[in-house]
Amino acid sequence: MKKRLFVLSLILLVALDQLSKFWIVSHIALGEVKPFIPGIVSLTYLQNNGAAFSILQDQQWFFVVITVLVIGYAIYYLATHPHLNIWKQLALLLIISGGIGNFIDRLRLAYVIDMIHLDFMDFAIFNVADSYLTVGVILLVICLWKEEDYGN
């Protein structure tokens, strides 16, 4: 992926995350639940003082340090490995985008705005950035697993 496309994609993904959070705050009261796709997904405005899926509540300094380290390492890795396959680049793009999206909330608000609730299962309320992070990590694990299978 070309550097310009990567940066543009990063900006668009972070903007989508931030716009979704802005919309939730503007249209749904704190704690209110609104069906989005009935029986499947509801939107609920929640202020999360923890990490993805509400773990490690009230550890803001920890998340700031970890986020800076992970994003910094991912950017360093991309810069020092210019010929990564597209899947690894996509995985790192999602991880960086998700990290930045939640980092903006932590710096600006001291909490992260969550809003997506899966009605069909007992699961934590999460946000778009959490989705990026989750998919990015899963994709990266698959890439690394495949490399191991091929002896790389």
UniProtKB/Swiss-Prot annotation:
The chain crosses the membrane at residues 5-25, 61-81, 84-104, 125-145. It holds the Pfam family Peptidase_A8. PROSITE patterns: SPASE_II. Its EC number is 3.4.23.36. It catalyses: Release of signal peptides from bacterial membrane prolipoproteins. Hydrolyzes -Xaa-Yaa-Zaa-|-(S,diacylglyceryl)Cys-, in which Xaa is hydrophobic (preferably Leu), and Yaa (Ala or Ser) and Zaa (Gly or Ala) have small, neutral side chains. Keywords: Aspartyl protease, Cell membrane, Hydrolase, Membrane, Protease, Transmembrane, Transmembrane helix. One of its GO terms (cellular component) is plasma membrane. GO terms for biological process: proteolysis. It is a multi-pass membrane protein. It comes from the Bacteria. GO terms for molecular function: aspartic-type endopeptidase activity. InterPro entries: Peptidase_A8. Pathway: Protein modification; lipoprotein biosynthesis (signal peptide cleavage). It is found in: Cell membrane. The active site is at D114, D130. This protein specifically catalyzes the removal of signal peptides from prolipoproteins. Belongs to the peptidase A8 family. This is Lipoprotein signal peptidase. The lineage of its organism: Bacteria, Bacillati, Bacillota, Bacilli, Lactobacillales.
